[in-house]
Amino acid sequence: MPIAVVTVLLLVSAALVAISSDAGLAPPGLAGLDVQWLVLLAWLTAGSASAVLLCCRRRRATTGLVVAGALLIGSGALVGPPRFSDDSARYAWDGIVSGAGISPYAHPPVAAELSGLRPLWLFPAVAIGSDGQPACPTPGSRLTRQTPDGAPLCTMINRPEVPTIYPPVAQGWFAAVRALLPREAPWWPMQVAGLLTSLGVTAALIA
């Protein structure tokens, strides 16, 4: 019975994580619910599963459920782009720049020198609003200006006017994740890398 309860709780937690990543997956009862509540519910169900596991002293079954839970909940986050932070846009961009043989510390994302590296998912097309001014219709994008010519530019990267702040070891990780992928590959490489890292840590803690 405890194993069945834990399995159900893990499935519910994974479903809540998936819904928090992509609101379009929400059933009618959860549609419109604030994403913070979804995350809280996911934590509560995962925590409840952990509590039941602590009471169930069957090591083999417990180990399998911990690994399965880590995989299920981590996979749930892959159904959509990150919603709580746009930092991964900078991670991906730094990896793309490094992969082109350019130091990510040399130029900010808005620099014209890097214009040939910009994928559309990180730099969506600029539109002209009803007032005749440039606008960024893509959700999550912000309007900035290319330097030095001042051309309007939309980007998903925060603080695009300044070079990266991430240290060399982090840059090595970003470059490694993006190394074998085309620039057009969007959010999922960093998400998958994060999931694999999480599973590795889980396995190390169990061993």
Segments and roles (model prediction):
Residues 1-14, 18-79:
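Start-transfer (signal-anchor) and selected internal transmembrane alpha helices
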